[in-house]
Swiss-Prot record:
Keywords: ATP-binding, Chaperone, Cytoplasm, Isomerase, Nucleotide-binding, Stress response. It is found in: Cytoplasm. One of its GO terms (molecular function) is ATP-dependent protein folding chaperone. This is Chaperonin GroEL. Forms a cylinder of 14 subunits composed of two heptameric rings stacked back-to-back. Interacts with the co-chaperonin GroES. Together with its co-chaperonin GroES, plays an essential role in assisting protein folding. The GroEL-GroES system forms a nano-cage that allows encapsulation of the non-native substrate proteins and provides a physical environment optimized to promote and accelerate protein folding.
Amino acid sequence: PYEKIGAELVKEVAKKTDDVAGDGTTTATVLAQALVKEGLRNVAAGANPLGLKRGIEKAVEKITEGLLATAKEVETKEQIAATAGISAGDQTIGDLIAEAMDKVGNEGVITVEESNTFGL
């Protein structure tokens, strides 16, 4: 029964990450899986589940604060191209994304579809 709860939790984490950020689902899934595994191990060893929950919540708060403190705004076309290029693993794709974002503006929508053709 605990494994099913853990699997549902990991699935929910991946979906929420995709909905909110659109990226990072693999990282979120690995982190959630580790939290569930270690949490169950600690509870089985006698740890207080509510104490674990409070500890996880405090850790999340501190990590979030740290990330927000070091986060940088991505504003220029060049910054967008560099960031998108890193994310895509291909600078040409990053440049195309930056160009598309430049054309549609901050409120615009860009739709990306898979293609069976090779190259761009």
